[in-house]
Amino acid sequence: MRYALAACLLLLAASSFVDAKKKKIADDELGELLDNIDADEEKKSVEPAKNPCEDHQCGWGKECVVGKKGEPTCECISKCPELDGDPMDKVCANNNQTFTSLCDLYRERCLCKRKSKECSKAFNAKVHLEYLGECKKLDECTEEHMAQFPERMADWLFQVMKELKKRRELHKLEWEELLSEAENDDEKKHVYPVIWKFCELDTKPHDKSVSHHELIPITAPVIPMESCIKPFLEGCDANNDGNISIKEWGKCLGLKEGEIQERC
């Protein structure tokens, strides 16, 4: 059963979450959307545009509004885009509350943080994405499943790398070369994919560590099918400093000391 789930995870992770048939959110898109949740604005190094908001990016759940003096400001988005009712648009928050979309979740968060009258529940000021899809009762993460998780995840990542290479979406020639090595070496096929995924997650910011926030793009799509992934990955933070180093990541996923290498 669990290996069948691993196959499902591969299909989920290796394909886009938004396509013509199933409107899901891709890992990279999800990471981009969550990158500036609480940011007010970000200036781009381009020439000033006529519209002050053109050069400013607001956090998710917010929109740029031109102030009375012509200055761009970020306000809670007035209305989220209307959707067609696809259940895959729904998201589950960390308080087990289902929202119509990511936009609605972070609009509510924004309104509540600013103590707006439109805020439905004050405690939603700290709400954030838990996983994609409507909230539901998740399977129990047993000790047995947790113990098996490192090997299953390493194998899953290897399959994901192979699929991305086939689709020419495995960025950087170095990873393609390492994958070719791994395909002919049983030991390396559980080493290189683990290091690759660490580098994929360590982007916002790229500081040679992975925060719990940076884990969201990998946990949010998978939690509904694999309840062990979040507690397992959070447990990789051995020193409880809020960040997972490459050594913590490698050790957590079963790599030996000499196999953990910095390649980001």
From Swiss-Prot:
Tissue specificity annotation:
Expressed by body wall and sex muscle cells. Probable association with basement membranes.
Residue pairs linked by disulfide bridges in the UniProt entry? C53-C64, C58-C74, C76-C110, C80-C103, C92-C135, C141-C228, C236-C252
Provide the binding site for Ca(2+). Answer: D237, N239, D241, N243, E248
> InterPro entries this protein is in?
EF-hand-dom_pair, EF_Hand_1_Ca_BS, Fol_N, Follistatin/Osteonectin_EGF, Kazal_dom, Kazal_dom_sf, Osteonectin_CS, SPARC/Testican_Ca-bd-dom
Q: Which residues are tagged as glycosylated in the record? A: N96, N243
Q: Which CDD domains match?
A: EFh_SPARC_like, FSL_SPARC
SMART domains on file: FOLN (SM00274)
Q: Per UniProt, which keywords does this protein have?
A: Basement membrane, Calcium, Copper, Developmental protein, Disulfide bond, Extracellular matrix, Glycoprotein, Metal-binding, Secreted, Signal
Q: Where in the cell is it found?
A: Secreted, Extracellular space, Extracellular matrix, Basement membrane
Q: Which domain of life is it from?
A: Eukaryota
Every copy of the EF-hand domain together lies at: 224-259
Write out the function statement from the record: Has a high affinity for collagen. Affects nematode body morphology and mobility. Essential for C.elegans development and muscle function. The cysteine-rich region could have protease inhibitory activity or may provide the framework for a protein binding module. Probable role in skeletal morphogenesis.
User: Do you know which PANTHER family this protein is assigned to?
Assistant: BM-40 (PTHR13866:SF14), SPARC OSTEONECTIN (PTHR13866)
* Name of the protein described by the UniProt record: SPARC
Q: What organism does the UniProt record list as the source? A: Caenorhabditis elegans
